[in-house]
UniProtKB/Swiss-Prot annotation:
Pyruvic acid (Ser): modified positions: 226
Active site: 86 (charge relay system), 142 (charge relay system), 226 (charge relay system), 226 (schiff-base intermediate with substrate)
Name used for this protein in its record: Phosphatidylserine decarboxylase proenzyme
The enzyme's E.C. designation: 4.1.1.65
Cofactor remark: Binds 1 pyruvoyl group covalently per subunit.
GO biological process assignments: phosphatidylethanolamine biosynthetic process
Pathway: Phospholipid metabolism; phosphatidylethanolamine biosynthesis; phosphatidylethanolamine from CDP-diacylglycerol: step 2/2
Keywords: Cell membrane, Decarboxylase, Lipid biosynthesis, Lipid metabolism, Lyase, Membrane, Phospholipid biosynthesis, Phospholipid metabolism, Pyruvate, Zymogen
Post-translational modification (record): Is synthesized initially as an inactive proenzyme. Formation of the active enzyme involves a self-maturation process in which the active site pyruvoyl group is generated from an internal serine residue via an autocatalytic post-translational modification. Two non-identical subunits are generated from the proenzyme in this reaction, and the pyruvate is formed at the N-terminus of the alpha chain, which is derived from the carboxyl end of the proenzyme.
Keyword Magnesium: no
GO CC term (a single one): plasma membrane
Assigned protein family: Belongs to the phosphatidylserine decarboxylase family. PSD-B subfamily. Prokaryotic type I sub-subfamily.
C-alpha cells in the first residue's frame, strides 16, 4: 500500500508543468531572495565557493557553482580511480553475469540503465559504484579516470526521487530516470559514468565534448542534487576497502585501484 500511494503522489506532482515552473523560478532573479535561507538550511560551505554569496544572482547559479582553485586535489597515482563528485557513498558490489545488480533490496538491470544488450554486456561480471549528491553538495561532475570517450547518450524522460524513500518505493529510479551516460575506454577497458537526473529538475548539462578526457577533468553538472552510477568491466578495479555506505566523499579522492593485467 505504501508503495502504491507513494508512486501515485509522485505521478500527480512530477509533471512537465511542475518541472517547468520550478526550473523557471530557479533561473529567475526572484529566487535570489531565498539563497541565504537555502545556504543556511543545507549548511553549504561558503569558504569553498568561487564567488561571494551575494554574487550569485539566482538559485540556479548557486546550484551550479564552481569551487575556489585548490579546494580539491585529484589523486595522482596512475592506477587510481577517483570520486567524480562530492557526495555520499551509497553502495558498491558485483554486476552479475545476468547484467543486474542489487542495491537497497532492489534489483537493477544494466540493460535498462544503458539502453541495450550490447552496451550492458561489457559490464557483465564487473563492478558498480553509486554516489548520491544532496542539494548541499557541489554539483559538478568530473572524470574518475583518463581515457577516450567512446559514446555519449541520453535515456529516459522523467525522473523520480533518488532519496531513501525513492530507492525503496520508486520504480528502479537509477535505471529508469532521465540519465546522461558517458562511456570511456581506458587502456582497452570500459567504464560508464551514468548521471541520473533528480525529480522535477531533469537538467544535466554536458560540458565536455572532446574525444579524450583526463582524470579529474570537468565533464558535466547537475542543476540539483542527484546520483552518479559508475560501471566497470570485469577484473578492472578493486574498490578501496575502507569505503563504507554513508561515507562522505570528495571530488578527486581515491575510491578504487586499477588491477594490473599481464
Amino acid at each position: 500500500m505504501r508503495r502504491t500511494l507513494y508512486r501515485l503522489m509522485i505521478e500527480l506532482t512530477n509533471g512537465r508543468f511542475t518541472s517547468y515552473i520550478l526550473r523557471k523560478f530557479a533561473q529567475s532573479r526572484l529566487s535570489s531572495i531565498i539563497i541565504p535561507s537555502y545556504v543556511k538550511v543545507f549548511q553549504i560551505n561558503q569558504d569553498e565557493m568561487e564567488k561571494g554569496l551575494k554574487e550569485y544572482r539566482t538559485l540556479h547559479e548557486l546550484f551550479t557553482r564552481k569551487l575556489k582553485e585548490g579546494k580539491r586535489s585529484i589523486d595522482t597515482d596512475a592506477s587510481s580511480i577517483v570520486s567524480p563528485v562530492d557526495g555520499v557513498f551509497a553502495d558498491y558490489g558485483p554486476i552479475e553475469d545476468a547484467k543486474t545488480f542489487d542495491i537497497k533490496g532492489k534489483r537493477y538491470s544494466i540493460v535498462d540503465m544503458l539502453g541495450n544488450e550490447e552496451r550492458a554486456q561489457r559490464y557483465a561480471g564487473g563492478t558498480y559504484m553509486v554516489i548520491y549528491l544532496s542539494p548541499s553538495h557541489y554539483h559538478r561532475i568530473h572524470s574518475p579516470l583518463s581515457g577516450s570517450v567512446t559514446e555519449r547518450f541520453v535515456l529516459g524522460r522523467k525522473s523520480y526521487p533518488v532519496n531513501a524513500a525513492g530507492m525503496e518505493y520508486g520504480k528502479e529510479p537509477l535505471s529508469k530516470n532521465y540519465r546522461s551516460v558517458t562511456e570511456v575506454n581506458s587502456d582497452g577497458e570500459h567504464m560508464a559514468l551514468v548521471k541520473v537526473g533528480a525529480m522535477f529538475v531533469n537538467s544535466i548539462e554536458l560540458l565536455h565534448e572532446r574525444d579524450t578526457v583526463q582524470k579529474g577533468e570537468e565533464m558535466a553538472y547537475f542543476t540539483f542534487g542527484s546520483t552518479v552510477v559508475l560501471l566497470f568491466e570485469k577484473d578492472m578495479i578493486e574498490v578501496v576497502q575502507e569505503l563504507k555506505s554513508g561515507q562522505e566523499l570528495r571530488l578527486g579522492e581515491k575510491i578504487a585501484t586499477r588491477l594490473a593485467h599481464k
